[in-house]
Amino acid sequence: VKKRAAFGNPKTARSYASSVYGDCLDIITIQTMPKGRKTVITTVDHKRPDVYQKLLEQVKLGHQAYIVCPFIEDSESERFKDVLSVKTVVDEVQQFLHDNAPMYKADSISGDMKQKDVLAVIDQFARNEIQILVSTTIVEVGVNVPNATAIAVMNADRFGLAALHQLRGRVGRKGDQGSCCLVSDTSNEKLAAMTMFPSGFKIAEVDLQLRGPGDILGSEQTGDSKVVDMILRYPKLAAAIRNYFQTKE
């Protein structure tokens, strides 16, 4: 009998494999951090100038930093008047550096830029020609700059837990202590969970509790489900049902 081992990180890939192979698939979970990696210290902050100062302190130590914003440009809608954009924040940071540390540079990338221009800025950041990179969530995956040790997420309450956890995974990737500032005018269970739990598994559990699983067969991605609720509340019952059908085969 041939045996195969597949390694994957994204939850979608694991879910797909479970759907295709069902009980024929053994899932082994690695719950330890990569060798040399430290838990990213996560805090909630309310004042942007204080956050910029914290990032500058990391830059002065020879490291680099990210700032992530929800919007590319400021919205004209009254509803989103307090939501920060890449264009606003990069202007603020550049002025902050000009006033406090003109030898350092900040720049930005966003989804409305041409791919070659985005890659050019990322390449400069990777070479430490840019010390602070302001962006949308396009840095969430696929960007690996080991020298980056700090990240600030503006209007963090507007992001999902999965996105926040992925974003803080951008820093501290070569063993240096990483830090993540969640900048928000409000405090809620979601942000509290980020400060309390470094584990993606625990973050996923909290996310499930806060949002609900939604439809198993359907399009709703949030809301209560009696079936999933029963499985979560009574794991021994779920295991007994699974064993029953396995023995019948």
Question: Predicted regions span which residues?
Answer:
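Conserved interdomain linker/interface between the two RecA-like ATPase lobes of SF2 helicase motors
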Residues: 23-90
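Short, charged, surface-exposed secondary-structure boundary motifs
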Residues: 14-16, 37-40, 160-168
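Conserved beta-strand scaffold positions in the cores of enzyme catalytic domains, especially
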Residues: 4, 25-29, 106-108
